[in-house]
Amino acid sequence: MSGPGTAAVALLPAVLLALLAPWAGRGGAAAPTAPNGTLEAELERRWESLVALSLARLPVAAQPKEAAVQSGAGDYLLGIKRLRRLYCNVGIGFHLQALPDGRIGGAHADTRDSLLELSPVERGVVSIFGVASRFFVAMSSKGKLYGSPFFTDECTFKEILLPNNYNAYESYKYPGMFIALSKNGKTKKGNRVSPTMKVTHFLPRL
């Protein structure tokens, strides 16, 4: 039995034709396309190709279910991606960064490696992707942060808004473990910190 999601997918071609119809017959002019030279467009293409490759490597049981994708609950590719720097106000203040060698750390200044793309995986859960390094921020079962070249379930974090308007990022796979930076800008093990500690508080900045 087909549901609302199936009907919406079936109507998509008709909607696209209706949107393109006003451009037909104008001296053969092609329909306008979105600019391909923007940073956002390039990141979108790279990110989607990475995730598609990563999902292909996952076991079938770990891949998003068709029903979840149709309902929008698991289709994070359709969500809003945010380019941000995650600032932790400890020590002299540090931005979380994903380095080209796969390490995760902190940098006081705005660096190319501290520009991150936060993408929704499902409601309240995000992935954190290093724009320059092309590594996902991931956390192991021992609470160690590392850079993953592919998207896995260790790359998912629950984004929690705190009373001070900072965010805490809790491992979705390993609840109770949080992303944290020390006063020296080094990563701290996620199983040795809590959201009451300042080292886990991050402010998303442009």
UniProtKB/Swiss-Prot annotation:
Biological process terms in GO annotation: apoptotic process involved in morphogenesis; cartilage condensation; cell-cell signaling; cellular response to leukemia inhibitory factor; chondroblast differentiation; cranial suture morphogenesis; embryonic hindlimb morphogenesis; epithelial cell apoptotic process
Keyword Secreted: yes
Any Pfam family hit: FGF
CC annotations in GO: cytoplasm; extracellular region; extracellular space
Keyword line: Developmental protein, Differentiation, Growth factor, Heparin-binding, Mitogen, Proto-oncogene, Secreted, Signal
Signal peptide, first to last residue: 1-30
Single Gene Ontology MF annotation: growth factor activity
Protein's cellular compartments: Secreted
UniProt keyword annotation of Coiled coil present: no
Entry-linked SUPFAM superfamilies: Cytokine
Chief location of this protein within or outside the cell: secreted
Disulfide bridge positions per record: none
Assembly mode: Interacts with FGFR1, FGFR2, FGFR3 and FGFR4. Affinity between fibroblast growth factors (FGFs) and their receptors is increased by heparan sulfate glycosaminoglycans that function as coreceptors.
Function: Plays an important role in the regulation of embryonic development, cell proliferation, and cell differentiation. Required for normal limb and cardiac valve development during embryogenesis. May play a role in embryonic molar tooth bud development via inducing the expression of MSX1, MSX2 and MSX1-mediated expression of SDC1 in dental mesenchyme cells.
Family in the record: Belongs to the heparin-binding growth factors family.
Protein's UniProt name: Fibroblast growth factor 4
Gene encoding the protein: FGF4
